[in-house]
């Protein structure tokens, strides 16, 4: 019986050793699997965080673009309103007594450029005033001229238009930043 017991003990020891080895190996496999799982989780978290940050950047960029577009639209609308108001003021200026001096200067400046002038063209509403100011050449009515004068030479083949609206249009680009700044305040 002692041999049976001895064999049984050896078998039991071998079983315990194999179980211990299997336990160690399974613990090692589980630990490695947990490490891989943790690494995968961390990798996914980093990827998600990167995507989240990229999404935030895109959202901010889109919001900035929308804001700038809204500002630009508001600025353009404001600029249009300002120039519309200025054009209305120019139309009203032609009705004030001081317009005589303004029209006189516009005629003088245009005639300095066109030295061989044959005629001065003005709006029909300003023709009487222009005739008071110009005595040496013809004054013709031209409904297309508003708030200023057109001086013509060589049978109308050359000429220059000098109007308040034309002057405003020439400096509009230079005034735009200043007007925008004032509208933003």
Curated annotation (Swiss-Prot):
GO terms for cellular component: proton-transporting two-sector ATPase complex, catalytic domain
A single BP term in Gene Ontology: proton motive force-driven plasma membrane ATP synthesis
Keyword Ion transport: yes
Swiss-Prot/TrEMBL keywords: ATP synthesis, Hydrogen ion transport, Ion transport, Transport
Annotated signal sequence range: none
HAMAP family: ATP_synth_E_arch
Family to which this protein belongs: Belongs to the V-ATPase E subunit family.
Protein's job: Produces ATP from ADP in the presence of a proton gradient across the membrane.
The protein's name: V-type proton ATPase subunit E
Organism: Deinococcus deserti (strain DSM 17065 / CIP 109153 / LMG 22923 / VCD115)
